[in-house]
Amino acid sequence: MSFQQEVSKRRTFAIISHPDAGKTTITEKVLLFGNAIQKAGTVKGRGSNQHAKSDWMEMEKERGISVTTSVMQFPYNDCLVNLLDTPGHEDFSEDTYRTLTAVDSCLMVIDAAKGVEDRTRKLMEVTRLRDTPIVTFMNKLDRDVRDPMEVLDEVESELGMACAPISWPIGCGKEFKGVYHIHRDETILYESGHGHEIQEVRIIKGLDNPELDEAVGEDLASSVREELELVIGACPEFDHELFLAGELTPVYFGTALGNFGVDHMLDGLTRWAPAPQTRQANERDVEATEEKFSGFVFKIQANMDPKHRDRIAFMRIVSGTYDQGMKMNHVRTGKNVSISDAVTFMAGDRARAEKAYAGDIIGLHNHGTIQIGDTFTQGESLKFAGIPNFAPELFRRIRLRDPLKQKQLLKGLVQLSEEGAVQVFRPLQNNDLIVGAVGVLQFDVVVARLKAEYNVEAIYEGVNVATARWVECDDAKKLEEFKRKSQANLALDGGDNLSYIAPTMVNLNLASERFPEVQFRATREH
């Protein structure tokens, strides 16, 4: 197969949803249909030893939430799908936001009983920045749900996207009988209890087929016909160009737990979602089909494998081909490195990557030299734009139970901050270590990982910090004056960037009024 064909068959997407909308279950079922897992793991099987394939840290296993992003690759139809699983828990935002910079499309999972929820809104704001195409799956139809038309209206009004239903539910809850596939003009009947295998489904051709009345009952059949007349009249038809521009989403209905409807959605996603896209670098736009290799690191994860005790930098290949043993240029450091041990992923199982193409995600072993946002190329000096760092919203002082382990504590915190799990600030005037996070659960993760991975027992104390900002100033003289007068509020973050730590928002506002030449930034590009 030619290089162009290899690139054009790639589909790299992430799943976004509110916690508990069924994202991990969908991930499982997508892998099942991609034959990647023969038996879909019982997710959150309380007490059972089968943990979902994509949840791998101890804490995730205990809590049944996906804490870290993992990558899974599998073939489907004539495509090769790279699925990036993003944390579903409310806290894990930074990692999730960055993952969304590494994909070409997204699958939005909505709990049809609840509609559009808060976390979905936040994630959609991020996809909006890049006009990412979105495919929608309305989940949990085997439970009692809201009126589907109402939920579609909510997606349109709250997320600003037109909805084009591709399938439509027949009943819901105990009365859920299946879906009518609008494009294929056929009804696919649902049978419950097939969570772990792909079921043989019965298909009835045509909406006016009397077999439909026999299968679902006359009342339900006639109300579905009426509903569909309304739906087809009121909803826009699927338009591929609007979809690619992020303005319209195809909508599928089903139940991931009941293993139903996921394959219809995958058919649509592989057919319509874009192959690897052109990427903006600060210097120029880079086409996926360019021969020369380029890629950027969007995530670093420590200790993915208890057997290996290592850190992996996840890299999205933007253009060209990775070949085992090839030399590439690490743009930030200016060094040429030879990479012979990159890995590909299949839900926690890794394999050595011999070859990978634009659109693929590979893992590089990282011994502390690679940072989030780093670019690797075959010589050209490029920096890919738009990989964000967010100012944390919650702060704690971290203290050791054993003061002799200060060195290990600092090492652990800096490594955890490099992978984006948390941010660490070292005030210039004292030896405190302040940890900043976007959500409360991140604090628990840090203490658990410090203990498990660095053998450091740490505890938190409250600290008088309301917010932090990264400080920039083009005028060196003014910056020195600012540093002299604001010494008590200044700190260095994990990457030694100057930061301003404000005890109150009022304090921050006063500082920015007193020093108009200084910029206080709430986000920082890596």
Swiss-Prot record:
Gene Ontology BP, a term: regulation of translational termination
PANTHER family: PEPTIDE CHAIN RELEASE FACTOR RF3
This protein's UniProt keywords: Cytoplasm, GTP-binding, Nucleotide-binding, Protein biosynthesis
InterPro entries documented for this protein: EF-G-like_DII, EFG_III/V, G_TR_CS, P-loop_NTPase, PrfC, RF3_C, RF3_dom_3_sf, RF3_GTP-bd
Organism: Vibrio atlanticus (strain LGP32) (Vibrio splendidus (strain Mel32))
Molecular function GO labels: GTP binding; GTPase activity; guanosine tetraphosphate binding; translation release factor activity, codon nonspecific; translation release factor activity, codon specific
Main localisation: cytoplasm
Domain of life the protein comes from: Bacteria
Location of the protein in the cell: Cytoplasm
Domain tr-type G: 8-277
Family: Belongs to the TRAFAC class translation factor GTPase superfamily. Classic translation factor GTPase family. PrfC subfamily.
Protein name per Swiss-Prot or TrEMBL: Peptide chain release factor 3
PROSITE patterns assigned to the protein according to its UniProt record, in alphabetical order: G_TR_1, G_TR_2
Biological function: Increases the formation of ribosomal termination complexes and stimulates activities of RF-1 and RF-2. It binds guanine nucleotides and has strong preference for UGA stop codons. It may interact directly with the ribosome. The stimulation of RF-1 and RF-2 is significantly reduced by GTP and GDP, but not by GMP.
Cellular compartments per GO CC: cytosol
